[in-house]
């Protein structure tokens, strides 16, 4: 520990020793009146802006510069004053400007706003600079904003970092379901996209050290404020059937929204059977409440291919949401969110699997399956927040209930097995959770108090019928109860902030279940009825040293765990006590103006795991049963080291990030697989084992004003080493994975747009002396947009995929087309999908030396016509 603290002190002294130039001054006219504008700093003879500041209401400005240049150029600019500059020595000083007001004849001036402006940690992107013909919603524009990425799941990242908050007019109505805003607020309604780095949503903590969070705020145009908008879309079409004939398609939308100063609302209904994934926008990208019942049981059905869901999803889906925010005063607000969905899906596919065995031939299995999945889901949440400069109070209550019914009919065959297998799985998850937070600021210090509690359960039943005289059934009811309280005190010592706290929590897990129909197993071994409790008391102290260009953080939490287990079937009771220490260290440094370096070191411990304590058999799916044979508590220790470099130059619209990391894990338990024909038993044994991983990645994006061009690149590589226990043989295994994604866009002429993308993945694994074949998957897509007139937009796209595993058909091709025509306030959209009528998609995967070959039925060729218009 002495050496650890010595390193921290040396780093602190080194960071503080970097010299810094501070330029301050006032900008005024000859009469002393403050003028509006901004001030920049650059090296004489160079165009790169190294520092930037706005002139405040008093005419004052302040610039910071870290560099070794002998001289620097300070430039003042403004709409009414023109440009003024001075070259001065590189030293801290006061530099005032006396400027002259210049009259401007607006009729003779073409005023064009800059696409990017920066004020402190906030970067404004002018939507009109990135919007193109045919862009309907703000999500279409976000994909072109420099540094912004929108993943397939809907998650938004900025220069490789996931956003932590999404606001509309500085209000978070959607509470993480920001896909509703991205996919429904029209692009014409948004003026600017604001990216806020080092974002601190709690006002009383602002100025007490910077965070590593990123947030996005949509600034609306005046015409979009204070007006209720109700928009609808009605769609109908036809699709070929897998056999013969055609079937009808429908696609409906109704969206209402209101954005005012004191109130925001959004109501949505969407439904279709045309393959559109309308549930993705309802996902909470902030994460769930952190409380969920244990789920061990599922029906094994066709997997999902690596193509957009619209290509394969045979669905009937309905989704409704109601979102409401009321601002009670400038600090207080209430938010209510309700989401309901009903989803019915058919899936059809064929899977060939080879399970690796070190001392025997691989287990080979063919599965031809058809599944139907039905679900109903309801989510309710309410949040009250009082967020002022002196105190913060928040209470968040959430509830979730769903009903799921899955049926899988399949023909299963292997070397010595051939049978019809019917699986029926039903589950009803239920969850309630509440979290209360109160914080008070006392001078430069802060007192915090949090309390939370929740309950979750899930009734699960899996029924498997094989042949005509064989029926197995697994019933399971897991429950979770969680309670906790947390309090801390933050003390500010000039450049050092210390946080000292106490944390107490308890989590109680219960499970009751029975496996029926296994005549070869003892009846008592097929029952589970147990309770498991974790009771933790911890104290912690966190220190943050803050300097002008970054900070150093040191965390020293210490905890004592008391854990108890009670197996009421086997009459076994155990109590364990374990100390836990989890120190962490992180360093952040802003290098020059646009560069940030970060390093993190973290040691973690986990003691106890409910999933390792059940001693009765549980049928996971029709092929696999699970069981634990351990007596001691599960223990896991993990050390993580990572580094990150970010370059963010919004003015030049260039972003780059690189990261690398290493992780090593020690465990005292391992899952052992034992095969018996196509069936397997997974047994948890007490056996020390370890795993390690190395990863590295690079991301880059660059926008050009020339031809509205942009280029994006993401490259990554990971290497993993781990151990497996199969049929009593302990093996050392490793896996390598490389990936690349490239995308670009260009508009060579006003009426032509071209977008191209390419993605690829290469993987290989090994266990013992066995090495798998290389698995390669590539996908490329090119889209052409034509805009012959302002009201008409034509889109044509072609897509190709390749894999090296299927010798008969390496390549697959797809083509789609669309026409959009707008007149007055009505928009007509005609789309055709899978015009080449591909019947199936082939995908291959290598996982722990197990090989998976998937053939999945795709949606046949289809055409859909949609009419959009505003009701209000």
Where are these regions (language model features)?
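Short, ordered, surface-exposed loop/turn motifs in non-cytosolic proteins
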Residues: 29-45
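Short, acidic Ser/Thr/Gly-rich low-complexity loop/linker segments typical of extracellular
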Residues: 46-60
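Structural signature of Gram-negative outer-membrane beta-barrels, strongest in the C-terminal barrel
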Residues: 448-456, 478-512, 518-665, 783-785, ...
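Outer membrane beta-barrel strand-and-loop segments of large Gram-negative receptors
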Residues: 524-530, 538, 628, 634, ...
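Membrane-proximal, glycine/serine-rich, low-complexity loop/turn segments characteristic
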Residues: 19-22, 26, 30, 58-60, ...
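Outer-membrane beta-barrel translocator domains and adjoining extracellular loop/strand segments
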Residues: 206-207, 243, 269, 278-284, ...
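A short, solvent-exposed loop/turn motif at the edges and junctions
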Residues: 42-48, 73-86
């Amino acid at each position: 520990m002495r050496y650890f603290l010595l390193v921290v002190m040396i780093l602190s002294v080194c960071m503080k020793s970097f010299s810094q130039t501070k330029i301050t001054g006032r900008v005024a006219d000859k009469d002393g009146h403050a003028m509006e504008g901004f001030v920049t700093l650059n090296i004489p003879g160079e165009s790169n802006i190294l520092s930037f500041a706005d002139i405040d209401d008093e005419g004052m400005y302040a610039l910071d510069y870290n560099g070794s240049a002998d001289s620097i150029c300070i430039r003042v600019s403004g709409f009414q004053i023109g440009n003024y500059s001075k070259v001065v020595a590189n030293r801290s000083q006061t530099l005032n400007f006396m400027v002259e007001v210049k009259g401007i004849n607006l009729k003779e001036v073409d005023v064009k706003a800059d696409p990017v402006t920066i004020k402190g940690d906030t970067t404004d992107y002018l939507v009109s600079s990135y919007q193109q013909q045919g862009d309907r919603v703000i999500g279409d524009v976000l994909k072109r904003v420099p540094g912004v990425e929108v993943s397939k799941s809907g998650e938004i990242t900025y220069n490789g970092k996931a956003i932590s908050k999404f606001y509309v007019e500085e209000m978070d109505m959607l509470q993480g379901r920001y896909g509703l805003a991205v996919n429904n607020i029209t692009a014409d309604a948004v003026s600017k996209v604001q990216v806020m780095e080092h974002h601190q949503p709690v006002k009383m903590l602002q100025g007490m050290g910077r965070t590593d969070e990123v947030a996005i705020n949509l600034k609306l145009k005046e015409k979009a404020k204070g007006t209720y908008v109700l928009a609808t879309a009605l769609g109908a079409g036809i699709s070929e059937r897998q056999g013969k004939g055609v079937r009808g398609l429908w696609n409906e939308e109704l969206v209402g929204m209101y954005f005012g100063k004191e109130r925001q609302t959004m109501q949505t209904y969407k439904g279709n059977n045309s393959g559109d994934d309308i549930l993705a926008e309802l996902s909470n990208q902030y994460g769930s409440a952190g409380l969920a019942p244990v789920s061990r049981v599922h029906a094994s059905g066709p997997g999902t291919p690596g193509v957009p869901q619209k290509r394969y999803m045979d669905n009937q889906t309905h989704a409704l949401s109601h979102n409401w925010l009321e601002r009670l005063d400038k600090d207080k607000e209430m938010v209510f969110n309700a989401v309901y969905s009903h989803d019915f899906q058919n899936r059809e596919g064929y899977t060939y699997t080879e399970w690796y065995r070190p001392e025997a031939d691989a287990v080979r299995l063919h599965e031809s399956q058809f599944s139907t999945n039905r679900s109903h889901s309801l989510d309710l949440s309410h949040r009250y927040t009082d967020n002022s400069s002196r105190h913060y109070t928040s209470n968040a209550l959430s509830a979730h209930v769903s009903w799921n019914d899955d049926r899988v009919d399949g023909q299963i065959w292997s070397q010595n097995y051939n049978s019809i297998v019917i699986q029926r799985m039903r589950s009803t998850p239920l969850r309630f959770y509440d979290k209360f937070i109160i914080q008070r600021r006392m001078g430069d210090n802060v007192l915090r108090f949090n309390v939370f509690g929740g309950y979750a359960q899930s009734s699960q039943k899996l029924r498997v019928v094989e042949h005509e005289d064989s029926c197995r059934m697994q019933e399971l009811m897991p429950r979770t109860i969680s309670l906790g309280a947390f309090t801390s005190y933050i003390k500010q010592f000039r450049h050092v902030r210390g946080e000292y706290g106490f944390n107490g929590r308890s989590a109680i897990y219960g499970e009751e279940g029975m496996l029926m129909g296994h005549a070869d197993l003892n009846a008592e071994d097929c029952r589970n009825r147990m309770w498991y409790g974790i009771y933790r008391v911890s104290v912690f102290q966190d220190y943050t040293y803050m300097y002008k260009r970054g900070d150093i953080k040191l965390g020293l939490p210490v905890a004592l765990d008391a854990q108890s287990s009670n197996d009421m079937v086997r009459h076994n009771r155990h109590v364990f006590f374990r100390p836990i220490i989890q120190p962490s260290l992180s360093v952040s440094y802003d290098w020059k103006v646009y560069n940030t370096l970060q390093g993190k070191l973290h040691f973690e411990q986990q003691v106890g795991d409910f999933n390792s304590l059940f001693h009765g058999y549980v049928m996971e799916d029709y092929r696999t049963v699970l069981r634990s044979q351990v007596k001691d508590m599960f223990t896991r220790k993990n050390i993580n080291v990572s580094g990150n470099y970010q370059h963010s130059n919004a003015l030049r619209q260039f972003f780059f990030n690189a990261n690398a990391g290493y992780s090593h894990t020690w465990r005292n338990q391992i899952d052992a697989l034992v095969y018996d024909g196509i069936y397997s038993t997974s047994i948890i044994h007490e056996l020390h084992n370890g795993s390690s991983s190395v990863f590295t990645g690079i991301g880059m994006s660059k926008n050009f004003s020339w031809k509205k061009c942009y280029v994006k690149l993401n490259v990554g590589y990971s290497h993993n080493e781990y151990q497996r226990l199969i049929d009593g043989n302990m093996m050392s295994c490793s896996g390598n994975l490389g990936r690349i994604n490239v995308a670009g866009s260009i508009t060579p002429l006003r009426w032509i747009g071209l977008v191209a993308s390419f993605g690829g993945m290469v993987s290989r694994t090994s266990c013992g002396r066995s090495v798998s074949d290389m698995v390669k998957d590539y996908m490329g897509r090119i889209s052409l947009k034509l805009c012959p007139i302002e009201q008409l937009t034509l889109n044509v796209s072609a897509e190709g995929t390749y894999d090296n595993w299927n010798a008969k058909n390496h390549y697959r091709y797809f083509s789609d087309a669309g026409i959009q025509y707008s007149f007055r306030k009505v928009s007509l959209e005609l789309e055709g999908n899978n015009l080449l009528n591909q019947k199936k998609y082939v995908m291959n995967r290598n996982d722990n030396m197990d090989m998976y070959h998937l053939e999945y039925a795709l949606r046949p060729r289809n055409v859909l016509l949609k009419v959009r218009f505003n009701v209000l």
